[in-house]
Amino acid sequence: MVFCIAPSLPLAAQGDAPRPRAAFRFSREAGQALGNLWQNSLAAREERAACLASSIRNDTVFVTAVAPLEPEDADSMGISATRSVEQCGPPQWSGTVHTHIALYTDELPSTRFSGQDRIAMRLWYDRWKSDGVFCLIYSARDAHCEADGIVGGMRGKAVGR
């Protein structure tokens, strides 16, 4: 299973040089687990979530493990932000991944994090006081991932959150 990743970091201020983007790579096992998460989400017709384990070297995030969460106590999309925040924290886990299956356009689900997703990401940071890695899967082969605190290969400190 190969995922095309569209990493995203804040745009540089006007006049600044563009910032390099972090790259994301997935182990074979993590890629297979993400594929299973997507297939299970489609079969259930509900979004699904999982914990992510990763390591960071230079400007690359290596996702090494994925552990699906059972879809209980969830919102209308099948995801419990509180549960994923509590179960997917350090030191074993470095963030979360979830699926977007509801169509946003005629052809695709949303390819970006929603406002609710951003709130869950903030809850994760507030709980663990650590930079996180977050992904969403929006097709059998595509995902969008973001990593807090990674700018041009340097691990940044969380400031002004």
Predicted regions and their residues:
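Bacterial N-terminal signal peptides
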Residues: M1-S8
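Conserved beta-strand-loop surface patch within small alpha/beta domains used
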Residues: L9-W93, I101-R161
